[in-house]
């Protein structure tokens, strides 16, 4: 059975956009809902408003250590979507964990890994 998380898209630091992987930052609707462990996940995502039908996506839960982050964030990259989702409600179905979150030596090394992760979510 899929683990589902529903949340609202909120503003972030736009780091993903600057490295070619724009993300929607998710604030869970239910603050008491258990959040999966930090890491990178293959997920399906869709919007309550219907502007995104069920799409395969890549989600990170963690602190973004490559960029010296400290707060835990939930960020989803939807490969085939280019639009504004701020304020939208997204539903996320966790399919499988791809890897642990880790600190990369450079943003370029992170991008190289993200491209591998992207290939992995399609399988």
Outline where the language-model segments fall.
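Short coil-to-beta-strand transition motifs
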Residues: 1-3, 53-54
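Phosphate/ribose-recognition catalytic cores of enzymes acting on nucleotide-derived substrates
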Residues: 11-123
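Charge-rich, low-complexity N-terminal segments
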Residues: 4-5, 10
């Amino acid at each position: 059975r899929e683990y589902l998380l529903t949340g609202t898209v909120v503003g972030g630091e736009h780091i993903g956009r600057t490295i070619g992987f724009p993300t929607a930052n998710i604030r869970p609707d239910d603050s008491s809902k258990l959040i999966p462990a930090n890491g990178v996940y293959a997920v399906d995502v869709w919007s309550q408003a219907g502007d995104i039908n069920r799409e395969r996506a890549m989600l990170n839960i963690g602190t973004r250590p490559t960029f010296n982050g400290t707060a835990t964030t939930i960020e989803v990259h939807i490969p085939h979507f280019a639009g504004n989702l701020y304020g939208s409600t997204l539903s996320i179905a966790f399919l499988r964990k791809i890897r642990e979150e880790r600190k990369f030596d450079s943003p370029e090394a992170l991008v190289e890994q993200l491209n591998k992760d992207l290939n992995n979510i399609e399988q």
